[in-house]
Amino acid sequence: MEAKSGNGRTLLGAAGARLRRRWDVAVVIVIALLLFAPRFSGPIDLRYDAGVYYLLGTSLAKGEGYRIPSEPGSPQALQYPPLLPAFVALHQVVLRTTDPAIVAPWLRTSYIAMFAFFAVAILTLARKFLRPAAAVAATALSLLHVMTFFMSDLLFAELPFALAAVGFALVANKEPLKSRLWPRELAAYALAAASFLLRTAGLALFVAWVFDALIRRRWRLALVRAAMAFVVVALWQGYVERVRTSNEYLHPAYEYQRAPYQFYNVSYAENVALTDPFRPELGRASIKKLVGRLATNLCSMPAAVGEALSTKDGYWREALRRFEETFRRLPPGGSDFIPIIPENIVLVPIYAFGMLVVAGLIAFVRRGNWLIPIIVLGSLGLICTTPWPGQFSRYLTSVAPFLTISGMLGWSRCSSVLRAQDLIGAALRARQLGWFARLLQWGLAGLLALTFAIQVRTVFRVFRVRQNDPPAFASALEGREGRHFFYHDAPWRDWEEAVAWLGANTSPDAIISTTSPHFLYLRTGRRAILPPMESNAATARRLLEAVPVSHVVVDEMGFLDVSRRYALPAVQDDPATWQVVHSVKGVRIYERTPISR
């Protein structure tokens, strides 16, 4: 009995020792699971670009090629690389159905597992450069960011891209024996290629991979890496060019199907060549405008990076207002609120984090590690070329792990240089400025504590709003019971209810114009397209009728107002032909008459 008792204590002691050694892994897994706990069940969110990814996967699963089946003529796709659609197709093939009511919940399960792996991968990478506590902090900053868990709720490429990018950095940062060089190179290549085939922004990983070898003067290795990267990039760009020069592309199913503003149906290069893709009447961007765009985006990047490490500017301002209301004992959300604390004070922690990232990148370079700095700078450079500053927070989600690790490295380095034993700290104390060094140390600690407090508050707020917002209007996608999603407010619910009416009251061959065409197709089976973005109402109406569009949905969506700005004037100017046949609060459905049913 004593021997058994001793063995039991030994096993418990060993388990306790392992737990103490791996407490950091346990912490980040718990954070990841807690972030998914309120949303374990139900389908993955298929709004926005997610609907396109799902439909492309359906086309692949059915053996119909890489096409968008929701569009008239099912045109070939060339905007999105094919790896995420292939991932969707794999689920559909295994489940033997393309029905989103069955497949979407399984996709959510896959994203839960992916999110857990993502958390552990960030921690593993962070531990290469940081102490365990700082590595956990870097991982938590990334996981608790509102955009990270929002992107994990959508069938978007951001989460798998970020996982592949972190995996690439883990593999490429290893220094194995020469005999293991090529297995490592092949693994790094596979992960970089996967990143590129998820989002073309993965080009930054290839660039970093090649430059890493050049900086280390491994000329032959750099040449081999460049050749390997060229193969993947050339294959995708060759496919894009083949589609663009095809007869089908040059003679589309309807006149504006391949217009440059049709961002789902054209290449990135063609879309970003516009001055503003959502205001195509401004025309193509000249060299001067492109340079101006780059300069403007570069100026806004420090704040965007600071927000990517903490939270979005709006949540900082909201927390500041709530603090002031509580301190002054004012009712929350009062319309007559006059702030005493300047709102722009929130820019101090935001820019401070941006500076910490710079300090961290410098620390990487001083250590001789160029890979992560080049990934970060290359990714930021690509983002700066885009005309969508409102999308920066989404794009930065994919590189957020590198930003948080760099930021925490900068934080750790700044904290250490202020200590008494460090040269700078000792110099300050020698000049009787030790109080200033301690003040800066407390400031750094306070910055981190404040950021975590704001992030946790934002998590609770966003989840509370998710629960209080109206659930999705029941359809085949959600089943009998509507589900809750992030940022699914009343305009979305009204749109879904209006779309349900269309599904019940239109013929199967109807073509509908709406701001969310792919999601409409998934919910109703009706072909759907974006409205023509033409400032001339008569031109827009002619294009709609030439498709021919049978119904136009004018919504109140906040994320995209093209139906109100372009489609509404077109149908309102011809009340004899276009009449309102149904409305749900602010959502109106116009029908072209006469329509044979």
Stretches found by the model and what they are:
Residues 48, 106-114, 137-167, 172, ...:
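Multi-pass, polyprenyl lipid-linked donor-dependent membrane glycosyltransferases
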